[in-house]
Amino acid sequence: MTEAQRPASGRDDAAQAPEHRARCQDLRQDAVRLLGKERVRSDETTRFLHSYDASLERGYPDLVASPRDTGDLRALVAAAYHRGVPFVMRGAGTGYSGGALPARRGMVILTSDLDRILDVDTDEGRIRCEPGVVLATVQQHAARGGWRYLPDPSSYQVCTIGGNVAENAGGPHALGGGPTSNYILAVELVLPDGSLAVLDEQQPWEGGLDLRALIAGSEGTLGAIASATLRLVRAPESERVMLATFARQEDALATVAEVFDTGLLPSALDMLTGALVPGRPDYADPSLLFAGLQGHCEEVAGQSRRLSRIARRHGGRPELLDIPAFLQRRAELVRDKVRRMVAASGCPRYYLFDAVAPRSSLAALMDSIRRAAADSGLPVLNTFHAGDGNVHPTPFYDPDDPGHRTRLLDFSSQVLRECRGMGGSLSGEHGIGLEKLGLMRDFFPPETLEIMRAVKRAFDPAGLSNPGKVIPSAEQAAAGGPRRAARAARRVRQPGLHVRRIDALVEINDSAITFADVATALSGGPYELPYEPLGAAPGLSVIAALDAGLPALREPSPARPRDLILGADLDRNPGEPAVSLGGSCAKDVAGYELRKLVYGGRGRLGTLRAVRLRLLPRPTDSRLIRGPEMPIDTAEMLCALVRTADLPFCYLGVLVTASGSASVTGRAELRGGTLDRHLGILQSVSPQTPWDVTTGDRWTDPVMRALADDGTSLAGAPAGSPRQTALLRNLAGGGRAAFMSTGHRRVWWRGEPPSPSRRSGLTGRIISAFRAAPP
């Protein structure tokens, strides 16, 4: 972004007006009355200390308040609403985009005392906490119960959960597991008027929309997070890291391409390129590749062998390390690189930003970064997440050079423009904030930006929750016409089905394309679409299944259906152009996550025309596992016992037939090695149980047959004893088959749901935001 494009942080003219100052003074008095004088500060030092983060941006508040609990938080937000004063939540201030800085002054609300762990469920794998809880604390609580919380940004020791949710934080392991949004089960959100909304995972199945998707990555523009319930995954049985050293950057990039072309998916795949030092073509610096491997022992052993062979084939020197040795080795290597860079260039400081391109474009993007470094005259390192195309170009600079800021911004703008041309995104984990606001119009067509503005109005009609972030105003967006038009032209898509193997992506541009069609297109290759809708047949349309919000047989492992959606196209109103949501990058946190709302949209947001879906490696072994018939309550106890063994089930539950008999039913899968050892563990857990273990097509599993479409709707209700047992008995008594899914935490059957739709007024406003005609 150039200086001319950059907003004046914290210097909004309206914020300097006498009426604004008077409103802030009134709000300060309200806050003192609510919290006490010691929790409300407006002195110059406090204001300065909360005017910056890890970016180059600045934004000065009028006052800073520190609530003690959710009641305080709601009261503060309600007071700000009453006085018409903007507010912004602030955690640890580690953001790289200025997201937690006040663009229009007003009140900064600190989450430092909202730091309680509210609940830890080690049986179900859930943690509920307040927004000020440090990420490392969540990780520690998870580890004590044998679980892991996967998002792991580099600031994990100080950053907070509220900030992670607001920015949709990722980290190295977002490659294998996805960003923060994939792990949010529920959010308590204080709306900008002080009221409280609870958004949870069940809403898409109960007539609502999955509004959690909007909160993750919204940068606090839709309200204040009061608490978040987070999904945990089982701690891996085995964990190693392959470190490979390459003399040439091109060979490291070729290794990355082959890794994905052959269908490998490491839990993390990061790269540290050789340094680019202008005027020093002789500067020799190796490139390093770090591949994280997590999972069951068979998976890690198989992946490490394959990765090492690929690295050697491209001239790399691989070595396999345990985690402590890797962390020490990486710290030494990075420290040495930085010291040598500073010594060679004379530039002691660095500027870090992020951008994203499809991983198939990584080699071209590295060439673009090299050209931008030469054009700017800046020495550059690039430590980045090679597996998902999320780059972190890091130019070094001399702060005493009066032109350094302009050169840094010109460098970042040049790289981002190149990403745009490759079909990339503005951000993969840092967010938009103030830093990239002026570039949103170049990456998003006007109709998509208008939907985002309408979503903002639906949550925040008065525009008080962190205004001036994420979405440019209509006036700002109007300035980018020619480049927007070029992007719109590129959105013309060829009908049919297209597989992009290195990107592990399938593009479906025809509602007639079925799951069988996708399977045929992927046959013989290393990838699969991990989605078989419960009770469906392979002849079902993929787009129809997503639009209906049909639950997956395999859920949440390896992925929830909504988390497979990288991009989607909607026809909203007759005569209007299709609106494009998301894109085709494995990692994308630019703007609101509108694309995930199409899961369960049921035509209410528009007609779903196209989707871009993430693919995953095929399992090397997949077995159907079923216990004998037994009473319902006995089957529930056996299912709970089996869950404690931490076996690689992609789904597990209790299947109740129409005749009333029940059995524990599931499927185990590995992506590397065989299941033989795990089947032995299963037998040892329940020695008296004669398990029936078979192979076969998932589409013909007993659960799929029991819930097959009979002309009635697929209905469900939240699971949980003793209500769950009574529900299963009632369904069996009525001659209906049912499946209690531990992954969904829900009971499924064919017929009428037991309770009315949970469509809220907020859902209605979001639907209107999509349907409204563009300005």
Q: Locations of the language-model features?
A:
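C-terminal substrate-recognition/cap domain of FAD-linked oxidoreductases
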Residues: R41-H50, L230-R234, R240-F411, E418, ...
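Short beta-alpha connecting loops at secondary-structure transitions
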Residues: T122-G125, M242, Y350, D400, ...
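Activity-critical C-terminal alpha-helical subdomain
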Residues: G438-R487, R758-P775
